[in-house]
Amino acid sequence: QTRETVEEYPIIDYIIKENKQAYQYLEKQLSRLPRNENVKVLVVDDSTSTRRYICSLLKRHKYQILEAKDGKDVLEVLESQKDVSVIITDNEMPNMNGDELCVEIRRLYSNDEKAIIGISGADSSALSSLFLKNGANDYLHKPFNSEEFYCRLSQNVDMLEQIATIKRQANTDYLTNLPNRRYFFEESSKSLKYLKKSNQDGALAMLDIDHFKSINDTYGHDSGDEVLKGLAVCFKKYFEKQLVARLGGEEFAVYFTDATTAQALKRLEGFRQFIELNSQEFSQEKIKFTISIGFASGPIYQIDELL
């Protein structure tokens, strides 16, 4: 009775203060709300009234909301709005059912890229398993109460964020926040495959801090780290449109995706000169250093060969 009374009002949530978990849930929800403003949810249903109801629930929790009336609309929205995080879809719709839509979405995106929540008012107990087997992350039976809706939605958004964090940590160098060696090899290899198909040349440069060991020996490893971090900031800005990475130690790499050999060489020489003139600004000890650059280009389609 309390639930039914409370849910008549446009509240965000309500919590019964029974135990410590209630306060932990409250804290989690309060931290969740500001982040929801950056989360796009796509609501799919051929029923206008159902879409409006679900959108009203999402609006309370500050989600960005997109709508579609059938599977065809969904695929068009996902083509233009690639940052959609969650798709909430009904099952019985014209042209394409919800379980069929799950299959189409999973052709393009994995479970850890976009979450799908199926909903249906059908009495069939097999429908939930059909949704899940076809790629949905979760399922709700209509009519559902707002509490369950919010809990399931939050859990799926949390899961996506946690996976994104793990991926980011796995692909990022902890010291410089540049992409690491693993990510660089994966992404540049994908690009080289495309270049091979289109009969284009690849271009890659390796950069190394000259006599970096002597910097660590003379000024200490903390100062050496400052030098690496300062160089990384300039590196990222100077080659903003290129794939850059720290390969390890004092070695960095840049893969050119949209530059001719002449343009790449000119850019690299400009960067080398900039570092030579401004390197003392990277550390408290005003350590001056220089960099050496190796460059390779041509019809080479294995990243190991270019390196």
Annotate each PLM feature.
Residues 167-186, 207-221, 229:
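Conserved nucleotide-binding and Mg2+-coordinating catalytic segments in signaling enzymes
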Residues 217, 265-269, 283, 296-307:
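Catalytic-core segments of nucleotide cyclases and related cyclic-nucleotide turnover enzymes
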Residues 244-246, 287:
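A short pre-motif secondary-structure segment
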Residues 1-13, 100, 112-113, 122-138:
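Alpha4 helix (beta4-alpha4-beta5 surface) of REC/receiver domains from two-component response regulators
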Residues 70-73, 97-101:
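Acidic catalytic/metal-coordinating carboxylates
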Residues 208, 212, 231, 247, ...:
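Hydrophobic framework residues that shape the active-site pocket
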